[in-house]
Amino acid sequence: MSGIEWIVEAQGCAAESLCDPATLGRLFKQIIDDLQLRPVGETQWHQFPKTGGITGLCLLAESHLACHTFPEFGSLCLNLFCCVPRSGWDFDTGLKKIFAAQSVAVRTLVRQYVQDSEIPGIEAPGLEDLSAASYKG
């Protein structure tokens, strides 16, 4: 059995969008809606007074969605973890559209909970099928 995690870095983002909780809220809503994820409670946000950067966390029935923004560097870091394999979200297109990101890097990790052979009758993608990958979109 395995889950999948996306670690995303967007660079060259518009600083003002990285300081806007409403913009980040729309991003979270879009990802959650598109992937049919199930939030558990309200997303929590913290804005840092000195830089305006924001940290956000949404607890999901499937695991979590988190972000950290660094407007002083024009960067946004996202982490989405789902405890079962699923299709990903188009982070490259979405982050370029919403935050005017100049570049987006996505690392996809398979989080292997147990060896597939330990669960009779269950076939889950192994590391050879969904190997950790990095790409720039």
Give the location of each predicted region.
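Polybasic/polar functional segments that serve as interface/processing modules
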Residues: M1-G137
